[in-house]
């Protein structure tokens, strides 16, 4: 990820922090680390309002850089900030809607003199307005999808079930560069790659907050295809 792009994204968050009087953010969830650091790490990005972002990492252990610091536990973050002569925040934001309660309490406890607030809505607001590079990434993704969809009619053969058709579509997507992982927001939300529905299964309700339902293959993931045969004259979603 280009550093100017990361700075632009971080500054979008900072501008919203200013409006709420927040001095710093401590970011650790994967999607937000990708947004602010460019990749997933086991660790924390400390984003102060008026100085460069600092990465405190546990894994991988081969990260280098002026603003990167290896740690074994988050309690070391405060010690490093003090060693560097950096002021501790008076108002800190954490990813309150995403962190487990115990981790939220632990991270908040690192800064006992700070007011700790939920920063998830603020980060989501910053991410909702896409940068030029993000828009270009959408365009490239759309082109890859279009190439895969062009091949879908050729993946069908008579006698297929919905799950077999779904597997073939997934194969086409992977060949066009799909990583095969999908991140979804929400405590009880789960998602898999693609959803092919046909017949009565298309009207089967799902507990998930998605547009499509389906019985699925197992109660452990009640959604999507359920081995319904694809029949002539039936719609396929």
Per-segment meaning from a language model:
Residues 27-28, 56-58, 71-74, 95, ...:
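Conserved beta-strand termini and adjacent loop/short-helix elements that scaffold enzyme active sites
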Residues 30-31, 55-62, 98-103:
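Short, polar loop motifs at secondary-structure junctions
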Residues 1-52, 88, 150, 154:
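Terminal domain-start leader segments
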Residues 43, 127, 225-228:
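A generic local secondary-structure boundary/capping motif
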Residues 66-80:
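Short acidic-hydrophobic, aromatic-tinged amphipathic segments that line or gate anion-handling sites
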Residues 48, 86-88, 195-237:
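Acidic/histidine-enriched ion/cofactor-binding microenvironments in catalytic or ligand-binding pockets
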Residues 44-67:
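Short, compositionally biased "basic patch" segments
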Residues 4-10, 79-204:
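Flexible, acidic/His-enriched mid-domain "rim/lid" segments that flank
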